[in-house]
Swiss-Prot record:
Positions that bind substrate: R118, R152, E276, E277, R292, R371
Source organism (scientific name): Influenza A virus (strain A/Japan/305/1957 H2N2)
Glycosylation sites: N61, N69, N70, N86, N146, N200, N234, N402
Note: The influenza A genome consist of 8 RNA segments. Genetic variation of hemagglutinin and/or neuraminidase genes results in the emergence of new influenza strains. The mechanism of variation can be the result of point mutations or the result of genetic reassortment between segments of two different strains.
Topological domain spans for side Virion surface: 30-469
Pfam families, sorted: Neur
Name the UniProt record assigns to this protein: Neuraminidase
Length: 469
């Protein structure tokens, strides 16, 4: 083969190889582009059912990176379906309560910018717990804190922080409110926020960050609500509201709300005579509330709310060891399950209890006269037997040498059961501590445990002499 033929042969082979390589590169490029764009659409399932992903050509931001033969392929991951909460798991069986959180707001106020608050509570979304309180529109080390013993001013707002984070200057003000309730339906937060004139207040219903509905005062006498979490089952939330006398007959109504819109309002029925500041918890498929009778009884009213047909019944906790303050000595206190006991019914304090079969777990101040100290215990037969007084599993949360205040319940869904937790408001300043001109609080939080536990006392802990006046 002469030199010219060799050159032609080598050139032909090289051209053939180059052509094959070029075609392979085109094929690889086409495959890569096809895999990149041929992703999957996750259709919104009907009736909250999980549906398979259908193929569609679409760009998404949610991607998973897979390395295959040095080629980067992006494919969509179908997002998890968000469902309404139904609280259908059983209640956890507990032996008592263990410490969970404490925010130390008053101690921190001695040297930092912390909001003046009262009426705190705790509520959780499916992944995290938050603390709420009604702020007074001022920090503690601020002349505006003078006179914050007053409950209802137009500057009060509902504050919301992750549980354990004190209400610092960066805290979100969720709404304008001097009375409130909040709950998460599994998809978004609902906030019920009451503000305005005593004789003509407004309740705003804020869902997923938007004002959806409102209702005005129906008795022109301080429309007010729970000061703790509401409860949502299968997308419908319920909240208890009262308008009328704080020491006489009032008009209590139970509101049912769907994604912020009022869908039904029911009047209180049953034997409860006066309802204030209910502490509610899910008791699937219904909701149960333990409230404050500020008129006739130191035994606590119970409201049972049927979430399917909106029917309502009420009664009183059977335990003869009653939960309100002030109250009679335990040896002379009574409850017949149906009626107020007419024992030191006025004024009262917000509190909680929850049923456990025939028994009842409850918390109350240690003092029968003042908002000082705090204890929890179980009363055997306290849910079913009139005037039952057999107390077990008593724990001191705050010793009787320190101030307490309101308390309330919140529920946390675990893997196999629903746990009950509670918070205690630790009030400092006026009216008891007159060296200062302000009134504010910190909180301590406990949750039910099936384990063992020790003893202690968890007061606010601030030295009033270190505090701004």
């Amino acid at each position: 083969m002469n030199p010219n033929q060799k050159i032609i042969t080598i050139g032909s082979v090289s051209l053939t190889i180059a052509t094959v390589c070029f075609l392979m590169q085109i094929a690889i490029l086409a495959t890569t582009v096809t895999l990149h764009f041929k992703q999957h659409k996750c259709d919104s399932p009907a009736s909250n059912q999980v549906m398979p992903c259908e193929p569609i050509i679409i760009e998404r931001n949610i991607t998973e990176i897979v390395y295959l033969n040095n080629t980067t392929i992006e494919k969509e991951i179908c997002p998890e379906v968000v469902e309404y909460r139904n609280w259908s798991k059983p209640q956890c069986q507990i032996t008592g309560f263990a410490p969970f959180s404490k925010d130390n707001s008053i101690r921190l106020s001695a040297g930092g910018d912390i909001w003046v608050t009262r009426e705190p509570y705790v509520s959780c979304d499916p992944g995290k717990c938050y603390q709420f309180a009604l702020g007074q529109g001022t920090t503690l080390d601020n002349k505006h804190s003078n006179g914050t013993i007053h409950d209802r001013i137009p500057h009060r707002t509902l504050l919301m922080n992750e549980l354990g984070v004190p209400f610092h200057l960066g805290t979100k003000q969720v709404c304008v409110a001097w009375s409130s309730s909040s709950c998460h339906d599994g998809k978004a937060w609902l906030h019920v926020c009451v503000t305005g004139d005593d004789r003509n207040a407004t309740a705003s219903f804020i869902y997923d960050g938007r004002l959806v509905d409102s209702i005005g005062s129906w008795s022109q006498n301080i429309l007010r609500t729970q000061e703790s979490e509401c409860v949502c089952i299968n997308g419908t939330c319920t909240v208890v509201m009262t308008d009328g006398s704080a020491s006489g007959r009032a008009d209590t109504r139970i509101l049912f709300i769907k994604e912020g819109k009022i869908v039904h309002i029911g009047p209180l029925s049953g034997s409860a005579q006066h309802i204030e500041e209910c502490s509610c918890y899910p008791r699937y498929p219904d909701v149960r509330c333990i409230c404050r009778d500020n008129w006739k009884g130191s035994n606590r009213p119970v409201i049972d709310i049927n979430m399917e047909d909106y029917s309502i019944d009420s009664s009183y906790v059977c335990s003869g060891l009653v939960g309100d303050t002030p109250r009679n000595d335990d040896s002379s206190s009574n409850s017949n399950c149906r009626d107020p006991n007419n024992e030191r019914g006025n004024p009262g304090v917000k509190g909680w209890a929850f049923d456990n079969g025939d028994d009842v777990w409850m918390g109350r101040t240690i003092s029968k006269d003042l908002r000082s100290g705090y204890e929890t215990f179980k009363v055997i037969g306290g849910w079913s037997t009139p005037n039952s007084k057999s107390q077990v599993n008593r724990q001191v949360i705050v010793d009787n040498n320190n101030w307490s205040g309101y308390s309330g319940i919140f529920s946390v869904e675990g893997k196999s059961c629903i746990n009950r937790c509670f918070y205690v408001e630790l009030i400092r300043g006026r009216p008891q501590e007159t060296r200062v001109w302000w009134t504010s609080n910190s909180i301590v939080v406990f949750c039910g445990t099936s384990g063992t536990y020790g003893t202690g006392s968890w007061p606010d802990g601030a030295n009033i002499n270190f505090m701004p006046i």
